[in-house]
Swiss-Prot record:
Molecular-function GO terms, alphabetical: extracellular ligand-gated monoatomic ion channel activity; identical protein binding; potassium channel activity; sodium channel activity; transmembrane signaling receptor activity
Signal peptide boundaries: 1-43
Membrane topology: Multi-pass membrane protein
Location(s) in or outside the cell: Cell inner membrane
UniProt free text on domains: Consists of an N-terminal ligand-binding domain that encloses a wide aqueous vestibule and a transmembrane domain that forms a narrow channel.
Note: The homologous nature of GLIC to eukaryotic nicotinic acetylcholine receptors and other eukaryotic pentameric ligand-gated ion channels, and its sensitivity to general anesthetics, define GLIC as a structural and functional model of signal transduction in the nervous system, also relevant for exploring the molecular basis of anesthetic action.
Segments crossing the lipid bilayer: 236-258, 262-286, 295-323, 327-359
Protein name (database record): Proton-gated ion channel
Keywords linked to the UniProt accession: Cell inner membrane, Cell membrane, Ion channel, Ion transport, Ligand-gated ion channel, Membrane, Potassium, Potassium channel, Potassium transport, Receptor, Signal, Sodium, Sodium channel, Sodium transport, Transmembrane, Transmembrane helix, Transport
Role: Cationic channel with similar permeabilities for Na(+) and K(+), that is activated by an increase of the proton concentration on the extracellular side. Displays no permeability for chloride ions. Shows slow kinetics of activation, no desensitization and a single channel conductance of 8 pS. Might contribute to adaptation to external pH change.
Lineage: Bacteria, Bacillati, Cyanobacteriota, Cyanophyceae, Gloeobacterales
């Protein structure tokens, strides 16, 4: 039934398999035991934060150096930034003797040591970061440098548009179980910007950092927070000849009706200039920021509409008085309108400037 000599060959194969697998099983048991009882090799996600020195919190000094800032979107209230992020802190576990080591500075990979978990609060999605350098001094001071790019969300205030100034914020926090463990500080020597940093249509005034004294709760954990502020002001000169002056010229043309005696001509003039103003306003509206509050430009546009409304009433009253055989009274109202409209318009603009700019 079976080939001759089959049973002895099967027995020999089983014996050979036992001789092969028994040593391998023993090695596996030893390796599992070493992994179970040996201390872990700490990496960035495994090393616990260094303990406070002399019952003081661990201070992480931060700095952001702007390389470029671009694509400021008024409607989305976002901007893009390309910059360096520098961190420094002391970890005594990394201290070494430069004489014995033969080096004055040691370099590490990000996975080899503990690194504070710095997060950008108002960044859309996650920042794109490339670690440039991680170096450690003999006393354990760690210098961390990365280059990053991000799209940042920052609320804008358009109340004074187009004469507005804005503060663009970049918020940093550090994750910590207890605020006594890790706090953020500003390294002023590492805060700055390139001289050629610019934003189209804006003047960059300053770039500073502010430490927020009050921590806030996030996911039942307290955070330490920094606020990097980029102060900018809008280049408003182009808005004057392109938006403001055309609206004023159209309005002033309608006032020539106060020097005409023809009712039909006056009505045609006022209504046609009103239509021109509406058409121009629709064209300008596409470039104006959409806000739930009144802006300075919006207030001027609304005020101009009011003057058109009053001008139509004046022309109608003037014609009514003439029909009712009161030409003298109609003429006096017309003469008064020639002075009253410009004066009231000037006073209204002064009031608006005071309300929006606090002069």
């Amino acid at each position: 039934m079976f080939p001759t000599g089959w049973r002895p060959k099967l027995s020999e194969s089983i014996a050979a398999s036992r001789m092969l697998w028994q040593p391998m099983a023993a090695v596996a048991v030893v390796q599992i035991g070493l992994l179970w009882f040996s201390p872990p090799v700490w990496g960035q996600d495994m090393v616990s934060p260094p303990p406070p020195i002399a019952d003081e919190p661990l201070t992480v000094n931060t700095g952001i150096y702007l390389i470029e800032c671009y694509s400021l979107d008024d409607k989305a209230e976002t901007f893009k930034v390309n910059a360096f992020l520098s961190l420094s802190w002391k970890d005594r576990r990394l201290a070494f003797d430069p004489v014995r080591s033969g080096v004055r500075v040691k370099t590490y990979e990000p996975e080899a040591i503990w690194i504070p978990e710095i997060r950008f609060v108002n960044v859309e999605n996650a920042r794109d970061a490339d670690v440039v350098d991680i170096s450690v001094s003999p006393d354990g001071t760690v210098q961390y440098l990365e280059r990053f790019s991000a799209r940042v969300l920052s609320p804008l205030d358009f109340r004074r548009y187009p004469f507005d100034s804005q503060t663009l914020h970049i918020y940093l926090i550090v994750r910590s179980v207890d605020t006594r463990n890790i706090v953020l500080a500003v390294d002023l020597e590492k805060v700055g910007k390139n001289d050629d940093v610019f934003l189209t249509g804006w003047d960059i005034e300053s770039f500073t950092a502010v430490v927020k004294p009050a921590n806030f709760a996030l996911e039942d954990r307290l955070e330490s927070k920094l606020d990097y502020q980029l102060r900018i002001s809008r280049q408003y000169f182009s808005y004057i000849p392109n938006i403001i002056l055309p609206m004023l010229f159209i309005l002033f043309i309608s006032w020539t009706a106060f020097w005409s005696t023809s009712y039909e001509a006056n009505v045609t003039l006022v209504v046609s200039t009103l239509i021109a103003h509406i058409a121009f306003n629709i064209l300008v509206e596409t470039n104006l920021p959409k806000t739930p509050y009144m802006t300075y430009t919006g207030a001027i546009i609304f005020m101009i509409y009011l003057f058109y409304f009053v001008a139509v009433i004046e022309v109608t009253v003037q014609h009514y008085l003439k029909v009712e055989s009161q030409p003298a009274r109609a003429a006096s109202i017309t003469r008064a309108s020639r002075i009253a409209f410009p004066v009231v318009f000037l006073l209204a603009n002064i009031i608006l400037a005071f309300l929006f700019f606090g002069f």
